[in-house]
Amino acid sequence: ASRDVIRKIREEVFIKEQHVPPELEWDSHDIEAVHFLALEGRNPVGCARLMPSGKFGRMAVLREHRSHNWGSRLINAIEDYARHELKIREIRAAAQAHAIPFYQKNGFNVEAGFFDDAGIAHLNVYKAPGAPETNYVFNPGRDSNLYSLDDVTSLVGWTEMMLAMRPRRAIIACSDLHHPLWWNHAALDAVRRFAAGSHRRRVKILIPSEMGGINRHPLLRLQQRLSSRISVRVSAEVRDDVLITGPWGLLELTSEMHGIATMGDASRVKKMEALYLPLTETGQRPKEARRLAL
């Protein structure tokens, strides 16, 4: 019976919500894994599985219960079982990029290197059960590395991860409106989640000029849906393609498949903010956007 309940949770979260193909969701590892089921009273709210090797995954919490700390409770249960029953020294997982702040909060270390799993950007995370975080990879303000991102998965993963870290604001300077990042559903959803997550958050989008049909661009359509949180301005001074997530995050897009990123160079981020933030105030609203607002 518990297996059926777990199956329903995974179907709801992974297959229906995240659009993971069913043939990728179900595998032979389910037979050998230890399965965890989180209950609120008698109501199932989440699940996870742990392999004998110490790798865990398929961790899911139903949408309506995600602000109730069930993810951390599942992690604690996995750690306890791995430590006392399996007697293993390390647990590992392939974490979705947007969930990295959650794993860091729970003491996990992150391995640099984004990869695709079922069409979703992931990173490997690991932890010695009961031990604190021991490295600063992808830790805002502490990680001084400069990262070269060499494919769309990495560019999207960085965008998802950085916006999930709740920066004070996000500035998107978009000199090339055809760049694949800003047509990617996962990247756009990360922008939407960030903007919708708090009434204090703001996304400021800058474009160099207007073009016919600009209101059909995904960024403009997103702005129309969240006009109180997202603004678009036109300025001929926009010559770069960057995502600034102050006070510590910066992604500079150098081509369609490449970008340079940092989350520890505060002076560089401050310089880029000083360059682009005034343009978000002095730039003009797109004419098509003004017509739509009438």
Positions of predicted regions on the chain:
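Conserved beta-strand in the GNAT
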Residues: 37, 42-60
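HKD (HxKxxxxD) catalytic microenvironment of the phospholipase D
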Residues: 231-276
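Conserved GNAT acetyl-CoA-binding A-motif
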Residues: 82-96
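PLD-like (HKD) phosphodiesterase/transphosphatidyltransferase domain
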Residues: 134-205
